[in-house]
C-alpha cells in the first residue's frame, strides 16, 4: 500500500497556522506524507512550516477585504492565476485528502480540490467563520468548528491543540498549593498588543504595593523596550519578556491572564483551565475576537473588557477585587469548556475519506 498524502492549507496568521501544524504533525505521526499549501515568502507560514519538516507549496493569492476598489478590480485575474497554480499543486502532490484551516489562501485551492474530486476537510477556528471557510463549507465533505453553531451542519470539536496544553494539572490541583501574591500573566502575542502594554503598567501603578500581583508581561519583540520604559515610569516591578517559550506551562502557572481573544488563545486557556480578562482586538475581521471571548465569559470562565471603554482605573479596580477563591471558581468554569479531541477528529475524518480514494 502506497503512503497516504495529505495537503494541509492554512496561512495568514498564527490563528490558522498553529492549529494547522497540530493537525499536520498528528497526520505525520500516523504515517501520512504531509504537504503544506500557503502563501510564498515572506509569509508567516513560509517562515514556520518548512522548519518543522513539511514540504511547502505556495500559491500567489491575497485577501481583498478592506483593500479598496482597485484590488477588487484585479480579483478575477488573481483568482484565475490562483486556480491554475492550485491545480498544478494538486496534480503534482496527488493528495488523498485536502485539509483547510482557513485563511484566504485556502479558497482557490479548496475549490480546485473539489473540482478534481479530492475529499475536502475543513476546520474553522473562530466563532465567526472566515470568508474562505464560509464558501468552502458548502462543498466540503466534513466540516469542524472550534465553537458551537458557527457553520450549518458542522461538528463542534474545539481547536486542534499541541499536546502540552492537554497535560497540565487540573485547576484544583494547581491552585491548592498557592499562597502569597496573585500571579498575573499578560500576553500580547507574537506582534504585541500596544494597548495592553500601555494600560496594564498604568493600572498596576494605581494599586498599593501590597495589592499588586507578581507580573509576567510578554510584549512582542518590537515592543519590549517601550514596555520596559512603561513599567519603569509606573514604578512597578515585573518580569518582561518578548516571547514565551512554553505557553502551556506559563498559563498553568498563572492565577489570571490578561490577553486578546484570538481563537487559539481562548482554546488554550480553556484547555488548561485559566481565567482571563479578555480585551479583544477591536479591528479584528467581523469582530470575531469579541465573539470568541463571549463564549467563555458567558460560561463564567473570565471577564470581557472592551478596549474602547477600558481604563487604567477600571482595570485596577477589577484586579483589586480578585482573590484565589474567586479565580479558582472561574478557572474551573473555563476548564469545563475544554474540547480536547479536535485534532483526533480531523485526523479520523482524513483516514475515513482517504479509504475511498486512490490518488
Go through the PLM ranges and name each one:
Residues 95-97, 252-267, 274-275:
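Acidic donor-binding loop of glycosyltransferase active sites
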Residues 33, 41, 55, 114-171:
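Active-site-proximal region of nucleotide-activated glycan assembly enzymes
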Residues 66-97, 115:
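An amphipathic, basic-hydrophobic alpha-helix
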Amino acid at each position: 500500500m502506497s503512503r497516504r498524502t495529505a495537503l494541509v492549507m492554512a496561512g495568514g496568521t498564527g490563528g490558522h497556522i498553529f492549529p494547522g501544524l497540530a493537525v499536520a504533525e498528528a497526520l505525520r505521526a500516523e504515517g501520512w506524507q504531509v504537504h503544506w499549501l500557503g502563501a510564498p515568502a515572506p509569509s508567516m507560514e513560509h517562515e514556520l512550516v518548512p522548519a518543522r519538516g513539511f514540504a511547502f507549496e505556495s500559491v500567489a493569492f491575497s485577501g481583498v477585504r478592506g483593500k479598496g476598489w482597485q484590488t477588487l478590480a484585479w480579483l478575477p485575474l488573481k483568482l484565475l492565476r490562483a486556480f491554475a497554480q492550485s491545480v498544478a499543486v494538486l496534480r503534482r502532490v496527488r493528495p488523498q485528502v485536502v485539509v483547510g484551516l482557513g485563511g484566504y489562501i485556502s479558497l482557490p485551492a479548496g475549490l480546485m480540490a473539489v473540482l478534481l474530486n479530492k475529499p475536502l476537510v475543513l476546520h474553522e477556528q473562530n466563532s465567526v467563520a472566515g470568508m474562505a471557510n464560509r464558501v468552502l463549507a458548502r462543498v466540503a465533505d466534513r466540516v469542524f468548528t472550534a465553537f458551537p453553531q458557527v457553520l450549518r451542519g458542522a461538528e463542534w470539536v474545539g481547536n486542534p491543540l499541541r499536546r502540552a496544553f492537554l497535560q497540565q494539572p487540573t485547576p484544583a490541583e494547581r491552585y491548592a498549593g498557592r499562597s502569597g501574591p496573585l500571579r498575573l500573566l499578560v500576553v500580547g502575542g507574537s506582534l504585541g498588543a500596544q494597548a495592553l502594554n500601555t494600560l496594564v503598567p498604568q493600572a498596576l501603578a494605581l494599586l498599593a504595593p501590597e495589592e499588586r500581583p507578581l507580573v509576567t508581561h510578554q510584549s512582542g519583540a518590537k515592543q519590549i523596550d517601550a514596555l520596559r520604559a512603561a513599567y519603569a515610569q509606573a514604578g512597578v516591578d515585573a518580569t518582561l519578556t518578548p516571547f514565551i517559550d512554553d505557553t502551556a506551562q506559563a498559563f498553568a502557572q498563572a492565577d489570571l491572564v490578561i490577553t486578546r481573544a484570538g481563537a487559539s488563545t481562548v482554546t488554550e486557556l480553556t484547555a488548561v483551565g485559566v481565567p482571563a480578562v479578555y480585551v479583544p482586538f477591536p479591528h479584528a475581521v467581523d469582530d470575531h475576537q469579541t465573539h470568541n471571548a463571549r463564549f467563555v465569559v458567558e460560561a463564567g470562565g473570565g471577564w470581557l473588557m472592551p478596549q474602547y471603554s477600558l481604563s487604567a482605573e477600571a482595570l485596577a479596580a477589577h484586579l483589586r477585587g480578585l482573590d484565589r477563591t474567586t479565580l479558582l471558581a472561574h478557572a474551573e468554569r473555563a476548564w469545563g469548556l475544554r474540547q480536547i479531541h479536535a485534532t483526533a477528529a480531523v485526523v479520523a475524518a482524513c483516514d475515513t475519506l482517504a479509504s475511498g480514494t486512490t490518488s
